[in-house]
């Protein structure tokens, strides 16, 4: 009787474990197909990045007045350097894109950056 109960518990636990692994694998595949890696999936689009941090990321902290052209030039330059196909980092590309969007938004709102 006890052996039967233990076998039932082990079988049920194993089934639950296998199903949870399958679901996690399916989610990982969906994220990979949509181009959202772990870093992209965990980043909130509306996460707050200060213009000061964004300037540092793009290497524009020593520039007195930042123009849209300055932002775009540094963005393209850094994105090319950090291309994952050439050994770059997808995480850094996400940070660079976030910095660009932050500074563009600040310029659009008329904030001094």
Curated annotation (Swiss-Prot):
GO biological process: protein import into mitochondrial matrix
Alphabetic keyword roster: Membrane, Mitochondrion, Mitochondrion inner membrane, Protein transport, Translocation, Transport
CC annotations in GO: TIM23 mitochondrial import inner membrane translocase complex
Subcellular location, record wording: Mitochondrion inner membrane
SUPFAM superfamilies: Chaperone J-domain
Family according to the record: Belongs to the TIM16/PAM16 family.
Name of the featured protein: Mitochondrial import inner membrane translocase subunit tim16
């Amino acid at each position: 009787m006890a052996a039967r109960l233990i076998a039932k518990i082990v079988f049920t636990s194993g089934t639950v474990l296998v199903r949870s692994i399958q679901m996690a694998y399916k989610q990982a595949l969906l994220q990979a197909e949509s181009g959202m890696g772990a870093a992209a999936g965990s980043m909130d689009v509306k996460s707050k990045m200060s213009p000061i941090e964004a300037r540092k990321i793009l290497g524009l902290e020593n520039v007195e007045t930042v123009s849209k052209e300055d932002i775009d030039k540094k963005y393209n330059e850094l994105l090319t350097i950090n291309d994952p196909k050439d050994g770059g980092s997808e995480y850094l590309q996400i940070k660079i894109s976030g910095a660009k969007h932050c500074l563009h938004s600040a310029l659009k709102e008329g904030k001094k950056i």
